[in-house]
């Protein structure tokens, strides 16, 4: 009780195929270090929920994985490939990391369809994106009925659905929410 789990403890919790590995990560914003010797192992197809009080470092962990923080030391890997110092765009293209921001990230003046297709443009796979977008429109009538309208007409819940759908169009191997 009261101590952080060791890497061996984490391996016992994630004995299968490790997808995401964080080793001895020291990261933060500017010169301020928020994470100190942080370790994490996540299996392929595993979901993980970070729970803790305000200021505990949950967002900093996600930001570090995606590339929004300064990494002072340590390593982040996806299936054994080091990605620690890659840009967010490189992480998306090379290992498939997508991030849904906490705040609204819908482009209000673009149509629902244009918003949905943005994920594919970022990943340079527009043909696949059109197919995925059609699949999403088939599944979600609310988005389908507004596909040619500006996204600003969507309710808060519909905007969140659009953000999540846009991330899924990219077919990420890691989805940070």
What are these regions (language model features)?
Residues 30, 110-131, 139-141:
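ABC-type ATPase nucleotide-binding domains, specifically the catalytic core motifs of the NBD
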Residues 51-53:
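The feature captures the beta-strand-to-loop junction immediately N-terminal to the Walker
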Residues 66:
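Helix-to-loop junction immediately C-terminal to a conserved catalytic motif
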Residues 74-82, 93-94, 128-133, 138:
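Conserved ABC transporter NBD signature motif
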Residues 150-154:
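Conserved ABC ATPase signature
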Residues 171:
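Conserved catalytic motifs of ABC-family nucleotide-binding domains
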């Amino acid at each position: 009780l009261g101590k952080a789990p060791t890497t061996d403890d984490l391996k016992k919790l994630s004995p299968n195929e490790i997808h995401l590995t964080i080793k001895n990560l020291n990261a933060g914003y500017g010169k301020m270090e928020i994470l100190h010797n942080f370790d994490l192992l996540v299996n392929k197809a595993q979901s993980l929920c970070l729970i803790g009080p305000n200021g505990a470092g949950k967002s900093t962990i996600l930001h570090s994985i995606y590339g929004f923080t300064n990494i002072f030391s340590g390593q982040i890997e996806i299936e054994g490939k080091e990605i620690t110092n890659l840009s967010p765009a490189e992480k998306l293209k090379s290992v498939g990391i997508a991030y849904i921001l906490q705040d609204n990230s819908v482009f209000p003046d673009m149509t629902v369809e244009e918003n949905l297709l943005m994920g594919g443009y970022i990943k340079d796979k527009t043909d696949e994106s059109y197919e995925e977008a059609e699949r999403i429109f088939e599944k979600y009538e609310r988005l389908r009925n507004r596909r040619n309208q500006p996204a600003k007409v969507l309710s808060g819940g519909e905007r969140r659905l659009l953000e999540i759908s846009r991330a899924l169009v990219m077919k990420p191997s890691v989805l940070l929410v």
